């Protein structure tokens, strides 16, 4: 509570899974908790759940895989909230498919990079100028333990997260003396809607 109370926290992909669980924790601690996602119904349901628990979310529809929508969304939050104090880059896409099965599916790699890497960068770089000007800000990137291993069938997903991890290490060194800090969390496998299509996980 001493860290986020009264602060503006944005959780991308905050309408379900890890993002929603994190959003509840931030709101419980007194943060102005903003969530975004593509599905308005899920956003509404998340807000209803928060209200039932005695706090509230501020919800915005946004598609982090769409660069123009990222720009629109960042500008909207700067106008409405003065930017954010904490950015949780959680929105992501996972694909479980062998490389051999992807020879004619190069779009698997493109769409995974679009959301997991380029989208995160677009949002982050949109908020960085204000963070630097205020000399404060913390960016948390939700990555994967797969980056630390050699996970078969997850090359598209792991590569996109590895790219984000590498960028974050570089950014952390560049902004270390400007009041902006970065954290990477290499999450293990978590049972969320994102992994639901893979029936293997049910066992």
Task: Describe every region a protein language model picked out.
Residues 40-41, 61-73:
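The beta1-alpha1 cofactor-binding region of Rossmann-like NAD(H)/NADP(H)-dependent oxidoreductases
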Residues 124, 160:
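Active-site helix of classical SDR
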Residues 29, 149, 170-180:
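Active-site-adjacent segment of SDR/Rossmann-fold oxidoreductases
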Residues 144:
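Residue(s) in the substrate-gating loop at a strand-loop-helix junction
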Residues 15-16:
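Conserved glycine-rich cofactor-binding loop
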Residues 94-110, 153:
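Conserved mid-core segment of classical short-chain dehydrogenase/reductases
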Residues 173-203:
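SDR active-site lid
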